[in-house]
Each structure stands twice: as structure tokens, then as C-alpha cells.
């Protein structure tokens, strides 16, 4: 199984890079994990609604190029479904049973995701109503993916 994490913007903070690297190493026992960082568009000060839409559209084009035709796509969006870790684990296991070999998670840029990407997604997922930095969300999601595999395995990691 392959798990892709497509992110808009470059990861800057060393502690986040280190945390993600640790979970990538742990995930290598269960799947081929790939994090794809895409260039984000600069958002001008006092950007108009039209400016924001254009920025999200450009980012969506970059995202779309990295999604495989047969990928099961989960886009992170505030309006998405929320799951406890156990249900998330079942979801990941269920995707492979349905015949998908790749699960692709998408984290948009600071403006969010364009509707085209949300429509392409097989599922919208939310980690709640809190606003978190997109870079921190990468670490949180990577840990939850690892946790999902550990739950499936029956490991005491998830207590």
C-alpha cells in the first residue's frame, strides 16, 4: 500500500521536519509513505475574493497533477467528517479492501482547498473546528496515519 500526503507550501520548522521524519520511518514497516510539497502562491496583503479564488485555483492545478487516477483521495477541510482514531484506522483498512493501492491525503494552503479538489476527493475529513497551522497539521496527520496502522495491528501504542 502507498500513502501519499500532498501539501501546499514548504515545511520550514526543524522540529516539525524531525517529527514527520520519525513517523515516516515508523510507517515504512506498513506502507510506502510519500510527502509531496508543492509551491504555494503568494497571497498579497488585502487580497480580494477574486485574488483568493485565483490563488486556490493555481494551487489546485498543482495538486491535481499529483493525484493518481486510481487514488483514494481524502482532502482535509473544516467541513469534512470527524472520526475517532479507531474509525480512521478502519477507514484506512477498508480502502485497501476495496481495491485501492494508494491513499492520497491533501492539505491545502493558507486559503484552503479549491472546490475542484474537494469534488475530486472521495472523502472530506476534518480534525475539528480548531484552526491549526498547515505545517503542524502535517505532523498531526502523519502521526494519526501511523496510529491507524498500529490500531489495526493491535499494538498497545494506542491506549
From Swiss-Prot:
GO cellular component terms given for this protein: cytoplasm
Residues reported in the UniProt entry to bind S-adenosyl-L-methionine: 76, 108, 127-132
GO molecular function, one term: rRNA (pseudouridine-N3-)-methyltransferase activity
Keywords associated with the record: Cytoplasm, Methyltransferase, rRNA processing, S-adenosyl-L-methionine, Transferase
Organism in which the protein naturally occurs: Streptococcus pyogenes serotype M5 (strain Manfredo)
CDD domains: RlmH-like
Record protein name field: Ribosomal RNA large subunit methyltransferase H
Primary location recorded for the protein, binned into one broad class: cytoplasm
Keyword Cell membrane belongs to the record: no
Tagged with keyword Cytoplasm: yes
Compartments in which it is found: Cytoplasm
SUPFAM superfamilies: alpha/beta knot (SSF75217)
Catalytic activity, EC: 2.1.1.177
Function: Specifically methylates the pseudouridine at position 1915 (m3Psi1915) in 23S rRNA.
Family (UniProt): Belongs to the RNA methyltransferase RlmH family.
InterPro entries linked to this entry: Alpha/beta_knot_MTases, RlmH-like, tRNA_m1G_MTases_N
Cross-referenced PANTHER family: METHYLTRANSFERASE, RIBOSOMAL RNA LARGE SUBUNIT METHYLTRANSFERASE H
Catalytic activity: pseudouridine(1915) in 23S rRNA + S-adenosyl-L-methionine = N(3)-methylpseudouridine(1915) in 23S rRNA + S-adenosyl-L-homocysteine + H(+)
Subunit: Homodimer.
